[in-house]
Amino acid sequence: MRMSKTLLALGVASALLVGCKKQDDNAAADTATAAAAADANATQTEAPAAKPAVVAFDIDKIPVSDKPLPAWPYIALPAGYHYHEADDLAGQSKDLARVPVWTGGQLLWVEGKTFSDAIRSDDGKTYSKFEVRKNLQQAIEALGGVRIGERSYDEATYKANEKALDDFRQEFDRIRDAYWYDADADTYVIRRADKAVWVVLQTGNGDGGILVAEGPLPDAPAE
């Protein structure tokens, strides 16, 4: 009888030890799994941001225009619309500034003379995004301009140039809405024999904005 009790006690003790070992093994496995997950998260967090793909702009693909340019800033608005500072166009111009233009594959920085202002409708005239965009497209193309983009840059391009773009948007606030990433914005270039004229147009539902930049012809892309 005493032997049976002893064997029973030993059996219970063995079962308890096995149970404890399983718990320890499970705890160790959980710890290892958590550590692996933490390492994976750390690896994902530390992964560098993807660099934007750059497609160099080739000005030689744009025909040279010799059509006469109107008085600065070259772009006349359609009837029923006016520049916000129509009485002080010179005040909206800078003799030398550095501004970005999105070519559809490259953020190109242009140094030269600039003009920027908001576009408003006259009193009694309802602003039409379609009307402004269509008429300005016709006006710019009549000067030999070519539209090279209808959207702004992507998020990766913005992130790679965030400080410079934010500084620009603060200085040129009339056209800032065209310089969010993935925004509606038309970009045109008028290639002259000795210079390039860039036009960035943003048209919203109630008003718009425009940037005109005149600078040297960009360098040809490296072969």
Residue spans for each PLM region:
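C-terminal motif of bacterial Sec signal peptides marking the signal peptidase cleavage site
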Residues: 17-19
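An acidic-aromatic pocket/loop used at catalytic or ligand-binding sites
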Residues: 21-223
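Bacterial N-terminal signal peptides
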Residues: 9-15
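Bacterial N-terminal signal peptides that target proteins for export
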Residues: 1-8
